[in-house]
């Protein structure tokens, strides 16, 4: 089968501490994950996503739009937070999510290449319940989703040849926020990790 190339938005999601959860309650964890998927899969489809690979506790999803991918990430995290409300802290299922826009190789129903690998590495550095996106993805969503972003600067991701500039999604909408927090100019006195960018819809 000949592989073809295309540009795609890739979302990588993984359950935090899945091995620990399985060790504590295997049957309960499997059932809880199944319930998460039953609730999440229709939402993924609604945002144009196609799950092309599952890894037990993880998902790799292709989207035709970066906006769709990021909006889906926000919905998935909101859904997980709601489902965890009545769950003890040590039993909660939380996603880490990474989103990247990049060139990928398509072989049948599978998708391969650096575009997928970068999304997976971004997921790995996201906080529990958090979302990290690449600069390539950020350029496409700024001003189109109702959240802010924290500039984490260039990050060296495992097995990725070049540093990737990363943005953490500020999951709470920040209506009326200024484009850059801080005083004395857009970057004065700030480290990259403290630069928070508003990404509210343009009027």
Question: Positions of the model-derived regions?
Answer:
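Catalytic NTP-binding/metal-coordinating core of nucleotidyl cyclase/transferase enzymes
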Residues: 1-72, 78-79
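Protein kinase-like catalytic core scaffold
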Residues: 9-11, 16, 100, 165, ...
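Catalytic beta-strand-to-alpha-helix segment of the class III nucleotidyl cyclase homology domain
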Residues: 38, 60-171
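Acidic, proline/glycine-rich low-complexity intrinsically disordered segments
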Residues: 181-203
């Amino acid at each position: 089968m000949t592989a073809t190339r295309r540009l795609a938005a890739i979302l990588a999601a993984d359950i935090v501490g899945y091995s620990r959860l399985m060790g504590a309650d295997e049957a309960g964890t499997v059932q809880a994950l199944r319930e998460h998927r039953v609730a999440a899969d229709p939402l993924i489809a609604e945002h144009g996503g196609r799950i092309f690979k599952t890894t037990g506790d993880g998902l790799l999803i292709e989207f035709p739009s970066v906006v769709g991918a990021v909006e889906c990430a926000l919905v998935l995290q909101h859904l997980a937070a709601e489902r965890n409300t009545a769950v003890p802290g040590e039993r909660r299922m939380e996603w880490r999510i990474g989103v990247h826009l990049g060139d990928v190789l398509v072989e049948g129903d599978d998708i391969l290449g650096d575009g997928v690998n970068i999304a997976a590495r971004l997921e790995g550095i996201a906080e529990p319940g958090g979302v990290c996106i690449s600069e390539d993805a950020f350029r496409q969503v700024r001003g189109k989703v109702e959240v802010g972003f924290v500039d984490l600067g260039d990050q060296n991701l495992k097995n990725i040849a070049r540093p990737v500039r990363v943005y953490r999604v500020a999951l709470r909408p920040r209506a009326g926020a200024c484009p850059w927090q801080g005083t004395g100019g857009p970057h004065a006195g700030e480290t990259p990790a403290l630069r928070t960018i508003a990404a509210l819809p343009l009027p």
